[in-house]
Amino acid sequence: VHILSHTLHYGTGVFEGVRAYLTENGPAIFKLKDHTKRLFDAASKIGINISFTEDELNKAQCDTLIKNNLKEGYLRTIVFLGNEGLGLRAKDLSVNVAVAAWEWPSYMDPEAKKNGISVIKSSHTQYENPLHSGNKIIGTYFSNTMALHEALDKGADEALMLDKNGYISEGSGENIFIVKDDVIYTPTTEHCLNGITRQSVMQIAEDLQLQIFEKDIDYEYLLNADEAFFTGTAVEILSLIHISEPTRPRLIS
């Protein structure tokens, strides 16, 4: 990546992350086609034309997994612009695509993954622009990063971000689900990523004939939840067991 890459300076790029799991039939990448489709959708929204087809990128990801001798792992595909011009007016820049793969057993500490994590309400608001909420656009992750660092500095494991209306949005990089009286709730996607793991959990819940609803969820509702968990490609499914609320710390079963 050139030091004057437009993406490095202005965040003009998109990315996707997928996980591969070892099955009885060999390694399999979870929801690969869905992730690649979302990558292309994100690129089109910010005016980037990827010169490869979705099938070609799917094959490239599978090949990368194999060439790295991985049975399980995480793959990151990134689309970034070249260095032919700098400044916001730069046009006709080259479009580059790279795929990386590595072992990443746990996004969190293994003990945290096993026992659950603590979260704290962030002072950083999520997604003012609905364009960004449905895709992984590089330049939109600054507030997420700041929210996570703020949470870690305060002794929590993760941040809980609210939207501009004060409703729960998501974690710094995860969707959230809340269980109350055997009913599952998750925020609408107006101000959060419509995660592919999120979609899978919702489909499984429906297949199991569990009640699940998308709705605006206020912070107080979380404090009174019976259960809560995060979902995401990196984090997979992770229990929330403690809310670091200064005036009312809350343990969740």
In which residue ranges do the predicted regions lie?
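Hydrophobic alpha-helical segments, chiefly the membrane-spanning helices
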Residues: 252-253
